[in-house]
């Protein structure tokens, strides 16, 4: 083993699991390869072949219930919480009922989607383990990093072939490609990198269920209430029949879920009878006892409350191909059960959450190669703490501290933690949150709850008490209402950087040569700005209309039934979420990435071409076409123009003008549920692949370099006036205009050392939110340590860093994404 380089400053806080079990569970996870488990989709397919005559809502429920009831109830060594999504420690269900094409293309050795060639995956950790084991005769490799047992490979191929013409993606393509008059624009958008790859393989998520009702009522009571609706049903018009379909579907999936849980109870009982170790036997008996009660009935104690939550959360996860499906406000949900259970000590609660977080991290997803690269394997499960209750009082509690401590100890990538900020929050809670940040894992992220309340008051008009109670984060950084919203289902991202390419080259993509927009005379700065805006408008409008077509196919192939049961108003209305059953249907967003690069480039154009007349517009554009080779002096001048993130009025105004135009245009289009699209801007891993498809920019960025991440994060190396200037620039934005937001800041560990360092960071957050900002997150890491981790990855298997709205294991990140994190400006306080 290599000896770690000691010329860097390590993290101040180094947590360790609280007990032997937690340490074992974490190590087992880290040592496991990534696996594909076809069991669920095999049973779903078997049912689908027999249910062709059924109405789609009831058919979807029947197929899902059948699959649930036939899944193997796997209880791993040392588990005390029952329930797993797959049979493996790190397992993914291939949802070929959503998209079979990407798997079949790989099996047939056909070309993947246009963006797959720009996709990079990590090399280490579980990925390396899978690739090594794939060299053996027992396994085949899928999607570059997942193993499938060789004896299941041909069966999986047959399942994919069955779904090839029936899956959601194929049904959607048949619809929009035959009707939509901008279909060619969409396909060219994928080829050029104007858009992220097709999102049908994993469209759903950013969804949080009503776990409060699930726990308090239990499934049996919900089944009885729904059956009463069915029995008392009297149609008033022909459309009322859809209510009956949904209610029967709801009962079907709930009964399937009860069988799923009962199978775990039976398995635990069988294992307990055979177990020789007295302590393990008691654990299995306790597990079986809990599984005979929850989630069918209300929990009797804290452990059962956690088990009940986990079953409902897991069952919702199994139903759909989710990214961003989240646990929500777990401290508020579970605190009453903890407070009223004298037999559960803080230490016991910490251990239980440590196990829960391992189980959440064990859930993997497999999709198209492009989306695996964009997501970097993260499911964006977001657990939000703190904030206010419905009455406006602070909502942090003892369980908030316990959850933070559990992640300080474990440092798992799932769930990412977040904090709803309010000045009423307890200082001990905030200091514990900063302690977690100082481990270097990049969470919790901090969100200004008052900004989200303003946004929701504008978009939904719901009472402020309702918004406070249900406010949560679904996915990376997207606020939503827990148990009340459809989720934030969107098409993917628009690449603002590619639009710069199109402006520079008169509507032609310089990489592929495809014409995306008509040429235009550019005489003034306003001409350049308006050309950019017009192309952006065209790209967004076409993207939104395309997605509206796609979601028609979603409703007709893979509507969410189980999840709809636990979203308010669906059962009352007799409508699933795809039919508009949720309370909130305005949460559908349009996403984009790279606007900071646009603002920087326009600022340089304005300064060098039109204000100072250092060069002509064509000279500057030619410099970017040549990747600045032979134009080094001009590039130096471009880099010398103030960029975003330095509290400089000129570039900040340009950014604000772009931002508000984007918000207004997005909100001017109607989503597939008949409500305005909600503007949002995020990043996930898009800065790397989006940057790869772009030429050099006028702001000094070179060809292929990543774009700026997030919404208001500066381009790496250009924020030269310190973190206070960064937050001043970001504070100029009205963050209540969008559903989401992200500001990345990176600090050297020495900058936050000790209690004074923690208080200084809290003061910075407080200043930002009072200005008012919306979201901020931190990497607290020495860049030299990250460089050492690139050189000696074997010494850093459990190193976690913040990427965008999520954290990831360093060794499982691509080299390009690692470089992007290293490249970010390292600040001091």
Model-assigned labels for residue ranges:
Residues 259, 263-266, 270, 286-289:
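Extended, non-transmembrane alpha-helical coiled-coils
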């Amino acid at each position: 083993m290599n000896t770690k380089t000691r010329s860097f400053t390590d993290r101040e806080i180094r947590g360790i699991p609280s007990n032997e079990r937690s340490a074992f569970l974490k190590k087992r996870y880290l040592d496991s390869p990534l696996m594909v488990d076809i069991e669920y989709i095999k049973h779903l397919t078997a049912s689908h072949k027999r249910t062709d005559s059924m109405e789609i809502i009831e058919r979807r429920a029947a197929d899902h219930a059948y699959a649930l009831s036939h899944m193997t109830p796997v209880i791993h060594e040392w588990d005390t919480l029952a329930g797993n999504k797959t049979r493996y420690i790190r397992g993914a269900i291939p949802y070929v009922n959503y998209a079979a094409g990407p798997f079949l293309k790989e099996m047939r050795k056909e070309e993947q989607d246009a963006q797959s060639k720009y996709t990079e995956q990590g090399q280490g950790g579980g990925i390396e383990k899978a690739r090594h084991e794939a060299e053996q005769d027992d396994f085949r490799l899928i999607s570059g990093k997942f193993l499938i047992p060789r004896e299941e490979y041909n069966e999986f191929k047959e399942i994919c072939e069955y779904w090839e013409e029936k899956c959601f993606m194929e049904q959607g393509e048949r619809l929009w490609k035959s009707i939509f008059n901008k279909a060619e624009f969409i396909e060219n958008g994928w080829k050029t990198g104007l858009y992220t790859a097709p999102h049908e393989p994993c469209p759903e998520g950013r969804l949080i269920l009503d776990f409060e009702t699930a726990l308090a009522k239990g499934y049996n009571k919900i089944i009885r209430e729904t059956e009463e609706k069915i029995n008392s049903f009297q149609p008033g018009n022909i459309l009322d029949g859809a209510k009956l379909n949904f209610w029967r579907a709801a009962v079907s999936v709930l009964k399937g879920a009860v069988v799923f849980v009962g199978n775990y109870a039976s398995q635990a009982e069988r294992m307990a009878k055979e177990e020789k170790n007295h302590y393990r036997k008691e654990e299995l008996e306790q597990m079986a006892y809990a599984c005979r009660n929850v989630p069918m009935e209300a929990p009797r104690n804290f452990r059962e409350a956690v088990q009940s939550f986990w079953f409902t959360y897991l069952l919702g996860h199994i139903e759909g191909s989710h990214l961003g499906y989240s646990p929500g406000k777990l401290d508020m949900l579970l605190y009453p059960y903890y407070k009223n259970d004298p037999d559960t000590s803080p230490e016991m609660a910490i251990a239980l959450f440590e196990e829960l977080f391992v189980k959440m991290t064990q859930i993997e997803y497999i999709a198209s190669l492009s989306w695996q690269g964009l997501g970097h394997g993260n499911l964006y499960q977001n657990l939000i703490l703190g904030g206010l209750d419905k009455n406006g009082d602070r909502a942090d509690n003892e369980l908030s501290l316990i959850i933070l401590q559990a992640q300080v100890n474990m440092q798992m990538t799932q769930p990412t933690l977040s904090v709803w900020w309010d000045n009423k929050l307890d200082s001990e809670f905030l200091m514990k949150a900063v302690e977690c940040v100082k481990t270097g894992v990049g969470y919790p992220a901090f969100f200004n709850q008052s900004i989200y309340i303003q946004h929701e008051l504008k978009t939904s008009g719901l009472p402020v008490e309702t918004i406070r109670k249900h406010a949560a984060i679904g996915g990376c950084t997207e606020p939503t209402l827990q148990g009340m919203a459809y989720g934030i289902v969107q098409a993917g991202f628009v690449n603002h950087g590619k639009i710069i390419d199109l402006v520079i080259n008169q509507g032609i993509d310089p990489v592929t040569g495809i014409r995306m927009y008509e040429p235009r005379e550019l005489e003034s700065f306003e001409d350049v700005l308006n050309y950019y805006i017009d192309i952006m408008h065209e790209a967004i409008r076409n993207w939104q209309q395309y997605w509206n077509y796609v979601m028609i196919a979603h409703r007709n192939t893979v509507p969410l039934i189980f999840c709809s049961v636990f979203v308010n108003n669906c059962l009352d209305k007799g409508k699933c979420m795809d039919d508009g059953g949720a309370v909130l249907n305005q949460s559908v967003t349009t996403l984009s990435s790279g606007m900071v690069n646009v603002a920087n480039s326009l600022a340089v154009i304005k300064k060098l071409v039109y204000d100072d007349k250092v060069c002509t517009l064509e000279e500057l554009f030619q410099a970017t076409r040549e990747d600045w080779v032979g134009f080094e002096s001009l590039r130096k001048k471009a880099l010398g123009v103030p960029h975003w993130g330095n509290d400089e009025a000129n570039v900040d105004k340009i950014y604000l003008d772009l931002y508000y135009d984007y918000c207004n245009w997005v909100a001017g289009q109607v989503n597939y549920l008949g409500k305005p699209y909600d503007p949002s801007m995020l990043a996930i891993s898009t800065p790397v692949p989006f940057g790869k498809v772009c030429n050099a920019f006028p702001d000094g960025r070179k060809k292929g370099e990543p774009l700026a991440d997030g919404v208001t994060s500066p381009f790496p190396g250009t924020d030269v006036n310190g973190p206070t200037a960064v937050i001043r620039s970001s504070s100029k934005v009205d963050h209540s205009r969008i559903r989401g937001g992200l500001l990345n800041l990176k600090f050297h560990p020495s900058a936050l050392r000790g209690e004074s360092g923690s208080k200084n960071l809290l003061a910075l957050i407080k200043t930002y939110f009072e200005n008012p900002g919306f979201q901020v997150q931190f990497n607290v890491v020495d860049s030299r340590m990250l460089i050492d981790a690139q050189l000696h990855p074997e010494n850093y298997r459990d190193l976690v860093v913040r990427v965008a709205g999520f954290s990831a294991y360093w060794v499982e990140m691509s080299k390009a994404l690692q470089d992007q994190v290293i490249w970010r400006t390292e600040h001091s306080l």
